[in-house]
A protein has these predicted regions:
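C-terminal helix-rich "cap/oligomerization" subdomain common to oxidoreductases
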Residues: 1-2, 70-73, 338-340, 347, ...
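N-terminal Rossmann-like dinucleotide-binding module
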Residues: 1-50
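Contiguous beta-strand/loop segments that form the cofactor/metal-binding neighborhood of enzyme cores
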Residues: 175, 199-306, 346-358, 376-379, ...
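Predominantly a Rossmann-like dinucleotide-binding segment in NAD(P)-dependent oxidoreductases
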Residues: 127-244, 386
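Rossmann-fold dehydrogenase core element
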Residues: 109-127, 146-150
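Beta-loop-alpha module in the N-terminal Rossmann-like domain of NAD(P)-dependent dehydrogenases
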Residues: 20, 39, 50-113
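Hydrophobic residues in well-ordered beta-strands that form the structural core
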Residues: 95-96, 121-123, 152, 295
C-alpha cells in the first residue's frame, strides 16, 4: 500500500528494536508514531530515549491508532504470524522480523491476508542488506568471479561488545531468553538453528544470484561429551549470547541448488561447541569460475590481506587481488569490524520505506521469508532423520515429528 510518509507503530522492544527505531528516525520519509511492549516501563524508557510521543502495552489498541499506517513487528517468533494477520486486517503495511513464522501454514496465511488487504509485507532479512554482503553481490553481478558455483560459510565465535545496548541483560532475561525456548523461537528442538539459519540460507541464495536451494543435508552430533569431558568443555568465559542446542549440535549443513553445478556448505566452529576458529562471527567465501570473494558478515572479524584488516577480499584468477573496507563505525552490539546492527538494519528499513513511498514491492517479501523458513525446516528435518531432504518434501507435520 503506497503512502506519502511512513508512520510507524513498532511492537516488541528487544535487542533489535533500537536499530529499527534509529533507522526510521534518520529517514526523512518516516516517523515513529508509537511503540508497544508488554513491559510498560520499558516502553516509557525507550520512548523518552528517542523522543517518541506515544506508548502502548496493548497491540490491538495500537492497531486502532489512525495516525499509524505501518507496523514494525520485532517480537519473538511465536507472535509474528498472529500479529501480522491482525496488522493486515487493520490495513497497516507490515515489516516483520525474521524468522517469518513457526509453521508453513501460518506463514502462507499471513501472505494471503496481506494480499487480500492490499498492504505491503516485508520480512526483515537483514543479512542481505549488510554493506559488505551487498558489495559482494555487486562484484558478482559485474562478472568479477565469473559464474558463482560454490558458497562456503564459516560461523565462528561471536563476542558481544562490553556495555553494548541490552548485552548486560542475562540470557534468561525475558527480552533475550526466548531464543533458547523452542516453544517461542521454533526449531522443533533446535531453536538457535531456526532463529539463525534463515539468515544463512538467504545469504547463500543472494550471493548465488538468487538461485534457489533445492535440497539440504545437515549433520547432527551428540553433545554429551561437552558435559562429560572437562578437558573439552565449551568455553563460556566470554560474553557469548547462545549455547549449543539441548537436542544436539548441528555443526555442518550442505545444500545444492536447482543448478546442479552449484552447491554450498555452512560450518560452525566456535567456543560454544568446543571448537576454535580464528575468524570471528559470520563470514562467506563465494567461489566462481574465474575468481573468489571472501567477505565478513554479522559479528565478523579476522579477515586480512597482505597484513591489513579487510572486510572483503576479491581474488581474480591470473589477476590482481583487491581488498575492501567499509568505514561504518563498527557494530553497536558485536566486537566486529563491520556494521550489522547499525548499518544493515538501516539499509533494510531504507528499502522498506522506499518501497512504500514508491508503491513497489520490497526486495524481501513474505514469500521470500516463507521460503527461508521452509529451507531451515529442511535442515532440521535432515538433522533429525539423518538423510538429505528436498525442500519440496517439507511439510509442517514432517518437521514437527520427533526424531
Amino acid at each position: 500500500m503506497k503512502v506519502s510518509k511512513v508512520r510507524v507503530g513498532l511492537v516488541g522492544l528487544g535487542l533489535v528494536a533500537a536499530s529499527h527505531i534509529r533507522a526510521y528516525l534518520a529517514h526523512p520519509d518516516a516517523e515513529v508514531v508509537a511503540i508497544c511492549d508488554l513491559d510498560a516501563a520499558r516502553a516509557e524508557e525507550i520512548a523518552e530515549q528517542f523522543g517518541i510521543a506515544k506508548t502502548y502495552s496493548d497491540f490491538d489498541e495500537m492497531l486502532g491508532d489512525g495516525e499509524i499506517n505501518t507496523v514494525d513487528i520485532t517480537t519473538p517468533t511465536f507472535l509474528h504470524a498472529a500479529m501480522s494477520i491482525k496488522a493486515a486486517r487493520a490495513g497497516k503495511n507490515i515489516l516483520c522480523e525474521k524468522p517469518f513464522c513457526l509453521a508453513l501454514a501460518e506463514g502462507q496465511a499471513v501472505c494471503d491476508e496481506a494480499a487480500r488487504a492490499g498492504v505491503t509485507l516485508m520480512v526483515g532479512e537483514s543479512y542481505v542488506f549488510m554493506s559488505s554482503i551487498m558489495k559482494a553481490r555487486a562484484l558478482i553481478d559485474t562478472g568479477e568471479i565469473g559464474k558463482p558455483q560454490q558458497i562456503r560459510q564459516r560461523f565462528g565465535t561471536w563476542l558481544e561488545r562490553p556495555g553494548a545496548h541490552d548485552t548486560e541483560r542475562a540470557i534468561t532475561d525475558t527480552h533475550r531468553g526466548w531464543r533458547l525456548d523452542t516453544s517461542r523461537a521454533g526449531g522443533a528442538g533446535f531453536p538457535w538453528m531456526f532463529d539463525h539459519c534463515v539468515h544463512f540460507f538467504a545469504t547463500a541464495e543472494y550471493l548465488m544470484r538468487d538461485a534457489r536451494i533445492k535440497d539440504v543435508y545437515a549433520l547432527k552430533s551428540d553433545i554429551g561429551w561437552m558435559h562429560e569431558d572437562r578437558d573439552h568443555a565449551p568455553d563460556t568465559s566470554e560474553t557469548h549470547m547462545y549455547r549449543p542446542e539441548t537436542a544436539g549440535d548441528i555443526p555442518i549443513i550442505t545444500w545444492t541448488y536447482d543448478d546442479p553445478a552449484c552447491q554450498g556448505v555452512w560450518m560452525r566452529a566456535e567456543a560454544l561447541n568446543g571448537k576454535y576458529d580464528p575468524m570471528f562471527g559470520f563470514s562467506v567465501s563465494v567461489i566462481g569460475e574465474t575468481g573468489m570473494i571472501e567477505v565478513l558478515g554479522e559479528g565478523g572479524r579476522g579477515l586480512a590481506w597482505q597484513g591489513r584488516d579487510a572486510h572483503l577480499v576479491l581474488h581474480r584468477k591470473g589477476g590482481e587481488t583487491q581488498s575492501f573496507c567499509f568505514d561504518e563505525g563498527g557494530d553497536e552490539i558485536w566486537q566486529s569490524d563491520v556494521s550489522y546492527y547499525s548499518r544493515a538494519h538501516k539499509n533494510q528499513i531504507g528499502e522498506f520505506i522506499g518501497a512504500l513511498t514508491r508503491g513497489t514491492l520490497p526486495r524481501y517479501t513474505g514469500t521470500d521469508g516463507l521460503h527461508q523458513v521452509r529451507t531451515t525446516m529442511a535442515a532440521i528435518c535432515s538433522a533429525k532423520e539423518g538423510v538429505p531432504v528436498r525442500l519440496a518434501d517439507v511439510t509442517d507435520a514432517r518437521y514437527s515429528r520427533e526424531a
